[in-house]
Design a protein with these regions (language model features):
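Short, ordered loop/turn segments at secondary-structure junctions
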Residues: 99, 122-123
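Amphipathic alpha-helical interaction surfaces in cytosolic regulatory modules
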Residues: 40-116
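Conserved catalytic submotifs in the C-terminal HATPase_c
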Residues: 27-28, 67, 123
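A short, charged, amphipathic alpha-helix used as a generic interaction element across diverse proteins
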Residues: 129-132
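Acidic phosphotransfer microenvironment of two-component signaling modules
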Residues: 45, 123-124
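N-terminal acidic, proline/glycine-rich, low-complexity intrinsically disordered segments
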Residues: 1-9
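STAS-typified acidic loop motif
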Residues: 4, 14-49
């Protein structure tokens, strides 16, 4: 199964040069969502939709690859936190991989790093086979 991509937040974000995209791919036991660009109030809807869809469909492990993500504001953080709770209630989990320093710093400052399992990269995460 190849990756499926969702870009932008409506016509404005897509017309604005596609500042943010979410690519979904199934790998091993995980759904991998790769975030690219700038995640903020204006671009966040595709991430919210992807996370809600995969939690609703019963994904036990959602790995969010933040490697290509250059910026994340409080909107993106809140979406991830809400999705983490929804996944946990459904018997699954959301993990993060590849956070670059500016994004990692926001997680540290807010304390959100303490509630997510974080990995240096996707391959390291996929090699960790802890149960959901």
């Amino acid at each position: 199964m190849g990756p499926e991509a969702t870009t932008g937040a409506g016509d404005e974000a897509a017309a604005g040069g596609g500042r943010f995209s979410v690519t979904t791919e199934r790998r091993a036991d995980a759904v991998v969502l790769t975030l690219s660009g700038e995640l903020d109030h204006d671009t966040a809807e595709p991430l919210r939709e992807a996370l809600e869809r995969h939690v609703r469909q019963g994904a036990r492990r959602i790995l969010v690859d933040c490697g290509p993500l250059g910026f994340c504001d409080s909107t993106g953080l809140n979406i991830l936190l809400h999705a983490r709770l929804a996944a946990q209630e459904a018997g699954g989990r959301i993990e993060l991989a590849g956070l670059r320093p500016p994004v990692a710093r926001m997680f540290e400052i807010t304390g959100a790093h303490a509630v997510f399992q974080m990995y240096a990269g996707v391959e390291e995460a996929l090699a960790d086979e802890r149960p959901a």
